[in-house]
């Protein structure tokens, strides 16, 4: 609602209150193409979304179900103008499929409405089919190195931008690159020792930095956050934490992306034994939900809109969707209440039936035969990137199992061991043993031949949708914009730009064996990634056009988890900042204690236990900045290997009988009575903060991470909210974490430095928090701040630096 109010106020400033209309843009040349490209497909005689038709003057003036689309002379009252100003993440944004209107198009529509919305007599709008995607040539040669591949990328992008009206900025300096790459690759700002090490390197220190960051233990944590958003991982649902741990371990061991996805789609069993099954459990093993999620997440295609009818915005038919859903049609989610287990298995009955239940009687519906509705790319001869991929997989297979070198591509995909040559993780070894146990008891956790087939079809290197969808997401994560937006909407009607750059990166991704680190290395070493942002004096339309064409860096705010960890890093909050006992305080709390009396309660009623009361939320936001820390190794450790046998031996009838007996038990029980007491304890106020990368996810709605954009991950097509809010400002200004990060602890290096050289301490603070030295003006101001009390002054300076935009935004 606040967004809409702001838009209405903005529109009101440019609207004319009188009936004297301004000069109008030309309808045929300026307005008609915008409406036909972006609106008529969903608002015509056959499709009247929201009750609105926009193909004739009469119909558009009649408005829709809820408001007037156009009020001549009054943009603020015109619902169409309001909705095209909304952000892509806002409900009701128009157009809700394809690209958003650019500022020039919005200005033209606004001027047209201000001028009275003139419409030539007899003109009827028709849907304008998308123009063919423009491409430039891609070199056929194999890049000699990642640096060479990055140079090819830059050249392709330059040629694609030759006719664009955009400004190209220079590349950033070394320290800015250090900060940007460290934030993007390992999810926090660089530390002072890391800055010094980087500056001491000779030669191409940027390449050395990239190699170091890609090998850093935090790389897996940072990119697990990326994958958790993409896969909608939720700790609160069955298998959520196990899936999160599986993704983390897969990235840590450099498991190829296609192998990971195969495991996610085909997994069966229990999450504790086969953590990849969390993807299937995440959608309750529902074939319809899984079909929509699989296509949208892994292929970037929103075929889910064809679940109930032919796709209203694309060419997919409802039968296409049902054919895809049939691959999941025999998958079952089984729950055993007595054993406390939930698992997936494969049944014998197809649950996906055609025609849909609202279009036929039950006896008329037939099981659907699975069909993959996406076509692979066909080549007259095997292209270079596929030849490289096949050769790489053959080498991997020979290294892991001693292959003959004559296997087919499918055999190479099935046999490759992504962990060949790597040190074995004992936890994963145990998990693999547990997985082999599942095969012994295959009658319980039956594998899915249908889903295994689907996994192979989706990850086939000739299926261009698969690689392009992932590359588009990674590119947007690193650069700020995707080649297609929304990121999961590859469609003939979507605005795909810089298609040749996307093609090149996708092919290199396939050729690398779907290696995430190789993809990121190419991007980070490119000049495109190193571009500086445009200055504030550049007109908005020029800046937005340049950012969209990847010739200037957009302003990107840190992810919530990255901002959290950067505050922890800047403030030395991962370790104690004071000696033990240096900050003792008294804290009161309420606990439940026994009274010595007994009371009678009904059978089955919960028995009170001695426990502390749930903590109140503090005004300083402390409880909104902490959360449950996850131990991924513990989550992946198999437990109770004998559980399968116990499940087999207990008949369903026996389990049900026990459950019914427990439910019917109603005899009264004698239990202890408890009362609430307030107690006061002395605590050492010397807090440490864990990394946000391994918190249970998503965080509660009021948590720091959610306030700074972490999505709920409840539905498809949900992306991070990068907009700013007053709540964010208050949490940074008044939050406990910012306060603790600002305080100067006696165990911090800067504490001793303050005693010796205040000017040097100021330089240290700037480099530690902003990864740069202060200007002379900033140094003068800081010295004045430290003049009365150096330690309090330094705390104030650090607090100010943590709250500035320069800290929160990626340079």
Each language-model region and where it sits:
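Positively charged n-region of N-terminal signal peptides that target proteins for export
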Residues: 1-8
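Bacterial N-terminal signal peptides
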Residues: 8-19
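A structural supersecondary motif
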Residues: 697, 707-716
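Solvent-exposed helix-loop boundary motif
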Residues: 22-114, 118-158, 175, 180, ...
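Primarily short, surface-exposed interaction patches in extracytoplasmic proteins
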Residues: 145-180, 184, 189-218, 223, ...
């Amino acid at each position: 609602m606040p967004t809409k109010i702001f838009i209405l106020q903005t529109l009101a400033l440019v609207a004319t209150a009188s009936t004297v209309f301004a000069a109008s843009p030309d309808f045929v040349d300026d307005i008609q193409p915008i409406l036909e490209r972006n609106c008529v497909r969903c608002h015509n005689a056959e499709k009247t979304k929201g009750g609105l038709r926009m193909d004739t003057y009469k119909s558009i003036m009649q408005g829709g179900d809820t408001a007037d689309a156009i009020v001549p002379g009054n943009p603020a009252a015109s619902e169409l103008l309001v909705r095209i100003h909304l952000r892509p993440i806002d409900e009701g944004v128009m157009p809700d499929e394809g690209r958003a209107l650019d500022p020039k198009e919005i200005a033209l529509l606004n001027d047209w409405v201000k001028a009275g919305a003139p419409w030539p007599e007899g003109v009827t709008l028709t849907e304008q089919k998308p123009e063919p995607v423009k491409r430039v040539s891609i070199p056929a040669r194999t890049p000699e190195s990642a640096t060479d591949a990055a140079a090819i990328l830059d050249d392709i992008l330059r040629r694609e931008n030759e006719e664009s009206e955009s400004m190209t900025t220079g590349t950033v300096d070394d320290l800015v690159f250090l900060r940007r790459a460290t934030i993007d690759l390992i999810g926090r700002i660089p530390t002072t020792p890391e800055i010094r090490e980087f500056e001491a390197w000779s030669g191409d220190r940027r390449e050395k930095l990239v190699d170091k960051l890609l090998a850093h233990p935090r790389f897996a944590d940072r990119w697990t956050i990326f994958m958790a958003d993409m896969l909608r991982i939720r700790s609160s649902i069955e298998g959520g934490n196990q899936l999160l741990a599986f993704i983390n371990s897969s990235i840590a061991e450099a498991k190829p992306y296609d192998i990971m996805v195969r495991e996610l789609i085909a997994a069966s069993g229990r999450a504790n034994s086969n953590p990849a099954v969390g993807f299937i459990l995440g959608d309750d093993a529902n074939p319809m939900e899984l079909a929509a999620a699989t296509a949208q997440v892994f292929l970037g295609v929103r075929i889910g809109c064809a679940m109930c009818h032919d796709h209203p915005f694309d060419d997919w038919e409802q039968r296409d969707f049902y054919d895809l859903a049939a691959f999941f049609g025999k998958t079952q989610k089984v729950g055993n209440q007595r054993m406390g287990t939930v698992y997936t298995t494969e049944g014998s009955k197809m649950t996906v039936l055609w025609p849909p239940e609202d279009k036929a009687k039950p006896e008329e519906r037939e099981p659907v035969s699975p069909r993959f509705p996406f076509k692979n790319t066909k080549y007259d001869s095997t292209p270079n990137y596929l030849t490289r991929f096949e050769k790489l997989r053959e080498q991997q297979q020979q290294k892991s199992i001693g292959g003959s070198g004559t296997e087919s591509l499918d055999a190479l995909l099935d046999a490759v061991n992504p962990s060949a040559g790597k040190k074995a993780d004992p936890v994963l070894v145990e998990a693999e043993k547990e997985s082999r146990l599942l095969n012994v008891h295959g009658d319980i956790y039956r594998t899915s031949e249908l889903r295994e087939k689907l996994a192979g079809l989706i990850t086939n290197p000739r299926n261009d949708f698969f690689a392009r969808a992932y590359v588009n997401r990674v590119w947007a994560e690193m650069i700020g914009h995707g080649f297609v937006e929304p990121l999961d909407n590859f469609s003939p009607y979507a605005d795909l730009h810089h298609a040749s750059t996307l093609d090149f990166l996708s092919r290199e991704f396939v050729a690398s064996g779907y290696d995430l680190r190789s993809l990121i290395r190419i991007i980070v070493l490119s000049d495109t990634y190193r571009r500086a942002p445009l200055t504030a004096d550049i007109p908005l339309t020029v800046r937005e056009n340049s950012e969209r064409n990847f010739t200037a860096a957009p302003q990107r705010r840190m992810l919530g988890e990255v901002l959290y960890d950067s505050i922890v890093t800047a403030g030395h909050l991962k370790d104690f900042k004071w000696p033990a006992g240096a900050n003792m305080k008294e804290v009161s709390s309420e606990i439940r204690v026994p009274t010595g009396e007994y009371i009678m309660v009904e059978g089955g009623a919960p028995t009170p236990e001695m426990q502390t009361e749930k903590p109140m939320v503090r005004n300083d936001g402390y409880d909104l900045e902490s959360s449950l820390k996850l131990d991924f190794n513990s989550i992946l450790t198999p437990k109770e290997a004998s559980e399968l046998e116990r499940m087999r031996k207990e008949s369903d009838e026996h389990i049900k009988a026990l459950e019914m007996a427990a439910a019917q038990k109603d005899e009264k029980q004698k239990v202890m009575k408890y009362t609430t007491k307030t107690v006061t304890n002395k605590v050492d106020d010397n807090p440490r903060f864990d990394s946000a990368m391994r918190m249970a996810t998503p965080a509660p709605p009021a948590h720091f991470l959610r306030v700074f954009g972490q999505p709920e991950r409840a539905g498809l097509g949900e992306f991070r909210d990068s907009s700013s809010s007053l709540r964010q400002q208050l949490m940074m200004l008044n939050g406990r974490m910012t306060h603790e990060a600002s305080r100067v602890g006696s165990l911090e290096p800067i504490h001793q430095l303050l005693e010796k050289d205040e000017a040097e301490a100021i330089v240290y603070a700037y480099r530690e928090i902003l990864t740069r030295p202060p200007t002379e003006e900033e140094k003068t101001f800081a010295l004045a701040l430290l003049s009365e009390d150096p330690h309090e002054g330094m705390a104030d300076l650090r607090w100010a630096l943590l709250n500035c935009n320069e800290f929160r935004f990626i340079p």
